[in-house]
């Protein structure tokens, strides 16, 4: 699922390359999905939370389509817990916002505001700058 036709085309190529079946490509907004409530056992959102206009609305929509007790996995950049890096992110966030990216998104605040319990956090990617976050949907 993506809004970008180019990203959907890339997904189609990967589906073909890996011979995947039972995979649908859907063009829609992750903050307003057409799926019924409780449609999925697990929802994975990679590199989305920091580029949507309203991260809270996005998380609420993910919770809506994930069944109670289901897993929600975020792979995203979140504001650093290192005070020096966090300050740099705060100072540069205006520039990043102009490019459509929020460098100052706080993981703990986002999850708390949306009543998501974090089960596990792992640092991933280059220099561990991104995080893989596993939550349980306790709606």
Segments predicted by a language model, with ranges:
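C-terminal alpha-helical "lid/dimerization" subdomain adjacent to the S-adenosyl-L-methionine
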Residues: 73-130
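Conserved Rossmann-like nucleotide-binding pocket used by diverse enzymes
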Residues: 26, 44, 73
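Short N-terminal helix/helix-N-cap motif within the alpha/beta-hydrolase-1
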Residues: 6, 53-57
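A short acidic, Gly/Pro-enriched loop at the edge of an enzyme's catalytic core
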Residues: 28-43
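Class I SAM-dependent methyltransferase SAM/SAH-binding core
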Residues: 1-32
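A short SAM/SAH-binding and catalytic strip from SAM-dependent methyltransferases
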Residues: 41-54
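C-terminal lobe and adjacent flexible extensions of AdoMet/dcAdoMet transferase-like proteins
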Residues: 132-139
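A short glycine-rich, Lys/Arg-flanked "PGG" loop and its adjoining helix->strand segment in the class I
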Residues: 56-68
């Amino acid at each position: 699922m993506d809004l970008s036709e180019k990203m959907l085309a890339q997904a189609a190529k990967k589906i073909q390359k890996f011979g995947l079946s039972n995979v649908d490509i859907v063009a829609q907004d992750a903050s307003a999905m057409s799926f019924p409530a409780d449609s999925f056992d697990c929802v994975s959102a990679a590199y989305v939370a920091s580029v949507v206009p309203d991260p809270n609305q996005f998380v609420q929509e993910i919770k809506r389509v994930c069944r109670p007790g289901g897993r929600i996995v975020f792979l995203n950049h979140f504001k650093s817990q290192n005070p020096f890096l966090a300050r740099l992110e705060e100072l540069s966030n205006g520039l990043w916002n102009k490019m459509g990216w929020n460098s100052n998104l706080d993981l703990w605040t986002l999850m708390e505001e949306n009543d998501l319990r974090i089960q596990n956090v792992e640092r991933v990617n280059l220099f561990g700058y991104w995080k893989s976050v596993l939550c349980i949907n306790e709606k």
